[in-house]
Amino acid sequence: MNSQANYLLPVPLSSEKLCARGFNQSWELARRIDCDKHIHKNPHILRRHHHVQHQAQENRANRQIAIQGMFYINPQYQDCLESASVIVFDDVMTSGATLNEIARVLKDNGVSRVINWVLLRTLYPSS
């Protein structure tokens, strides 16, 4: 499983949603992926600022706007990302807005390569 990556990171939930649900489904799946020992799995590097309303009915443009500025890097891990290759794992991808925003944040913080792994892809109407 992609031996060139340094980290495997799940898409984070907001603290509100994590407390309500009790677990991050992306992390529960990602931590069970059998990958090379040197790929560090870590649910604490990526953080989400706050919860927004459920976006299931939003069009692609509105999703991209709503997700801007939503994610950040935990300052405790900032230095370890310099020139790293990172796999971002999401359970379900709809428009790709979340993964695009996370990739932007990671690259803005020194990551050299972002690879997206997605378990399921929804059918999304073009709009």
Sequence positions of predicted segments:
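Conserved PRPP/pyrophosphate-binding segment of the phosphoribosyltransferase/PRPP-pathway fold
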Residues: 1-88, 95-126
